[in-house]
A protein has these predicted regions:
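Hydrophobic ligand-binding cavity/cleft-lining segments
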Residues: 1-45
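A short, structured loop/turn motif at beta-sheet edges
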Residues: 20, 55-56, 81-88, 108-118
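Short amphipathic alpha-helical signal-transduction/dimerization elements
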Residues: 28, 143-151
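A generic structural micro-feature
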Residues: 4-8, 53-55, 70-74, 98-101, ...
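Hydrophobic/aromatic beta-strand elements that line small-molecule binding cavities or substrate pockets
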Residues: 14, 50-53, 76-82, 93-94, ...
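Hydrophobic pocket/interface hotspot
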Residues: 23, 33, 61, 80, ...
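Beta-strand/loop substructures that line and gate deep hydrophobic ligand-binding cavities in soluble
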Residues: 90-140
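Short beta-edge strand/loop motif at the mouth of beta-sheet-based domains
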Residues: 11, 31-73
Length: 153
């Protein structure tokens, strides 16, 4: 029996030791994104040539991770629904060609002062419980990697 996809929510909150503008760049500039996106699980590579970002409302987002061991590719793509620099991004990820049946990711960055930023990433995704757990593990690993990079600057 195949498990039916249902609306699942994943929320990750982190306080980062970096100014909000730098965290914003980490999410919106390919040279920054390739250093942490999807690499938290290690064993995955995101080359700059595999990133397309048009960070404007209606602009597109596409990243293709490559598995270092077997060359398998995993693509995430979407459309920026909302862009409020340097505070908020909303990305709509349609189901076509994806491992899920549609998702919306909301990024909120709050300036805490003293060079610190609270980052909240909330993804609402149509998927199975098992795939949600896998997605949450991957997202948490990527966010941990982002925190490591920002704190080592």
């Amino acid at each position: 029996m195949t498990e039916a996809a249902t609306a699942q929510e994943i929320t990750i909150t982190r306080v980062l030791e970096a100014p909000r503008e730098l965290v914003w760049k980490a999410w919106t500039e390919p040279d920054h994104l390739v250093r942490w996106w999807g690499t938290g699980a290690r064993g995955w590579t995101l080359p700059p040539s595999a990133v397309t970002m048009e960070v404007t409302p209606g602009g597109t987002f596409r990243v293709t991770l490559t598995n270092d061991e077997d060359g398998t590719e995993m693509t995430t793509e979407g459309v920026y629904r909302e862009v409020v620099e340097p505070e908020r991004l909303v990305i709509d990820e349609p189901a076509e060609g994806a491992w899920h049946e549609g998702a919306v990711t909301e990024l909120t960055l709050s300036d805490l002062g003293d060079g610190r930023t609270e980052m909240v990433v909330k993804t609402t995704i149509q998927t199975t419980d098992e795939m949600r757990r896998n997605a949450e593990t991957g997202m948490a690993g990527s966010v941990d990697r982002l925190a490591e990079i920002l704190e080592s600057r």
